[in-house]
Amino acid sequence: MKKSVSVKFDRRRKYYLILDCETATLPCADGLPENEKKKIAIAKPLIYDLGWTIVDKKGNIYLRENYLISEIFSVPSIFNTAYYAHKRPLYLEKLDKGEIVLTDWRTAVSRLEFALSITEAVGAYNAMFDFKKAIPFTELYINQLYSADFHKWLSFQAECCERIVNDTVIGNNKEFDPNCFRFRSKEYPLFDLWGLSCQYLLDNDEYKKACLLNGWQTESGKYFKTSAETTYRFISGQMDFDEAHTAIDDADIESEIFALIVKRAKNQVEIGIEYFPFRILGTVRKFVCQHPEFADMVNLEF
């Protein structure tokens, strides 16, 4: 993984922000069955670990920043809802070593706003979640937390969560722009490393064969896995690589993925979010029908 090469920014150079976050959710989800908690966690994410890198097109890292958000991490009823809540000792160790900063949301976001101000575009592996759900909902939560109506708002959110669990959510008519991250009255061009990886790195026979040989299929068996973890395994040749699922470590590998995408895309950074990008690769069934030598390795009963 490439290390930071500088902390000085040349305005003539083009920089890009690669962001990752780890999230919990509202305390009303605690104690629910895992499938119900997952629904709420996807719809109502609260960021406790926020990290990003600033890179150039070659993947050189000019800045790495990583923050634990005190309003989420330091509140057990919220942090305990996190899928990776068992990593709490790891974060405490990072704090002791000075590898991460514990601060409030508004302080962390002020640093993020600076980073956004010097970059050409921003992205993440699954930008839809990070930029369209996690950051906006955490911003909303924090604003409500410091308002007089917080408990009333939280009760309303509990009702919303009940509808989510029961699949009775009313449709959202808010305008959605797949090319833009809007935050605090400003707009930033947005790219999605997941979709770009599927397009430029993974939609080939070599990757699909690697998926079959290593069992990288979705839970249903219908599609090939296209996660940041399997993508990094493939491009690095480190087939035993396990994603850290901590924000800054994941942002590091995503910075390498970004650099290879740009190289394959002839030095272009394509803006926008592709819906369901894993479909770009086609189904496992279709690939196996074209390559019958793999038929004995997969279950096509789906």
Enumerate the predicted regions with their spans:
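Short, function-defining helix-loop hinge/capping sites that tune catalysis or transport
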Residues: 28-30, 134, 200-203, 258
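Conserved non-catalytic scaffold segment of RNase H-like nuclease domains
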Residues: 2-139, 170
